[in-house]
Amino acid sequence: MDTLHGELVLGMMNRIVCRGNLLKSSFYSSSRIGYSSIYDTGSIRSFTSTGILSNSKSKLTGGGNVDGNKGNNGNEDLLKGFKSKLDHSKDLFSKYKSLLVKNIDNVKEAIREANRKFAEQEAQAGVDSKLSYNKDVSTGGVIGGLPSEREIRRRKWSRRLEFYLDSLQETIFSASKAFNDVTGYSSIQKLRKSIDLLQIQLEVMKRELKTLRVDYEESIEKRINSQRQVNELLQRKSSWSATDLENFTQLYKDDATNSKREQDLKTELKNKEEAQEKITDELYSAILTRYHEEQIWSDKIRRTSIWSTFMLMAVNLFLFVILQLFLEPWKRRRLVRAFERNVRTSLEAQAADHQLHYEQLNAQLQEQSRLIQQELEMEKFKDDKRKQDEPQTPSTIWGWFLQLINKLQNLSPMDMNCQTNFNTLQIYLLVTSVGVISSILTTLIS
């Protein structure tokens, strides 16, 4: 097989070299023809410039319609080609869409079938009741995390995975086949099978050729031997016996038969060699086509992977830009608002607590001040009473009277909300003085 591949590669290289030489010679010949045609057209243009100028009006009038019709026809052809390509693309899209939907339905059906089989197996398996004791006697609860439970869960998931793989095997095969159909690798696989069949046919043809060559050489040897025996008999023709005559006749017949067989084998060998050459040429062409198609397929897959990578990078870049320009500021504002809301709530709660504490403290202080004021008033009342009980001198009474005058001077007759404290003696003096003054005024008036 290695020698066969080596021969095939050498044959392909020779063909490529021959084709390259042919292309080179055709290129040189075409280039020479092109140069001569350029020179010829240049001379023709130089000689016919006046004719072009004289016929310019006719071209502008009559040729414009022709060019316009050609342009319209070209546009119509382009539209038809575009429509045909669009229809072909729509057909391919609908075909691949139906294949995708079919594969998705197959996957769903396979998963449902795997779940059904797994549920049936779990229902049939059961658990040994003697090995399922998990009660904690000291606390009355359930003992969890036993190794048997973990092992049961592991086995359950492994069996489920096996069911999924078994059920999805056909779906995966059909999906891979559909992918190969989409990418065109199925045709390459058919071409590989054709190459394998051609190699097998070539091997069979080589074995048949080898057998034919052996038979052809044997027929030649038989013919040579029969001719030698005939020549030996002809040399002693004068002394033939009846047996020699029979041998000569038989040898002559055998020689004719051997000659005919040799000719038939030669013809068959020539046909087989031509068939082998044809199969070899087909094999060379198939291998070259396979390498060429695989190269195109790999380039297409590589190009698709590169573009898909670029698309993913573009999507990631777009998402990054969207995230940085819109989502991150929105998230930041949302966090700031939430933080401000929390801070405001906490500050309001703290302010309410402080206000409540301040009100309680203020109430306590007012209560204490009220109690202190009451105590002071009681003490003052006791002092006044004690002073009233004591014998008073005229100087003391005169001092009280001066204090009353000072308080009266501090009072403003226009201010009705002013407050002043008077003790009992001062009130008595005030009433007495008012009575004396009023009596004096009445006497004066009367």
UniProtKB/Swiss-Prot annotation:
Mitochondrial intermembrane side: 327-424
Main location: mitochondrion
Keywords, ordered alphabetically: Coiled coil, Membrane, Mitochondrion, Mitochondrion inner membrane, Transit peptide, Transmembrane, Transmembrane helix
Gene Ontology terms: biological process: inner mitochondrial membrane organization
Bilayer-spanning residue ranges: 306-326, 425-445
Annotated localization: Mitochondrion inner membrane
Superkingdom to which the source organism belongs: Eukaryota
Keyword Zinc-finger: no
Topological domain ranges for the Mitochondrial matrix compartment: 446
InterPro entries: MDM33_fungi
Record's bilayer topology term: Multi-pass membrane protein
GO cellular component terms given for this protein: mitochondrial inner membrane
Signal peptide coordinates: none
Summary of the function given for this chain in its UniProt record: Required for the maintenance of the structure of the mitochondrial inner membrane. Involved in mitochondrial morphology. Causes growth arrest when highly overexpressed.
Family: Belongs to the SHE9 family.
Subunit structure: Homooligomer.
Protein name: Sensitive to high expression protein 9 homolog, mitochondrial
Species this protein is from: Vanderwaltozyma polyspora (strain ATCC 22028 / DSM 70294 / BCRC 21397 / CBS 2163 / NBRC 10782 / NRRL Y-8283 / UCD 57-17) (Kluyveromyces polysporus)
Gene name, Swiss-Prot/TrEMBL: SHE9
